[in-house]
Amino acid sequence: MDYTSSLNLLLVINGVGIPGRVIPNHLADRYGTINMLMPAAGAAGICVFSWMAVKSTPALYVWCCFYGITAGSIQSLFPAGLSSLTTDLRKAGVRMGMIFTIVSFATLAGPPIAGAIITASGGTYYGAQAFAGAALMLGMVLMAAARGVKVKRLMREAGTTGWGWHVKV
């Protein structure tokens, strides 16, 4: 792929990410931030896994549209999701700082790890794509666990029982 096409793909991902940043946040006001963040992370993981099947430039543009929407959703819902898991709002800033510090290490280490995987697999991207998709799916599972703990606490405080599928978190 030439340089101009790669820049166009970057513009497409960021451009289609705009509705991905706005619409899920609007829905999060009604259904809960974590309840919107989990499917967004799952959809992004599926998109990254499906990247392995993309073989042509037009298909890559289509893939960028889907991934841009899901990635934009994650980027905008993530900080709001952190605050929704915090019960004591005086600690929200400290918790966000701690989480963003942890995320910064992952952001710093992710590209070299992906590069090492690409080098080890002879220049193909399949291993790095699988690594990225698995990381997103693991993140979704961990968000589901955090949601489960929060819902259990909320239901215990309210004196109710059940699975808590309709709890806004």
Segments the model singles out, each with a brief description of its role:
Residues 58-67:
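Paired small-residue
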Residues 13-22, 104-108:
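Residue-level signature of mid-helix packing/kink "hotspots" within the transmembrane helices
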Residues 84-85, 89-106, 115-169:
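Intracellular terminal tails of multi-pass secondary transporters
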Residues 1-15, 94:
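Loop-to-transmembrane helix entry
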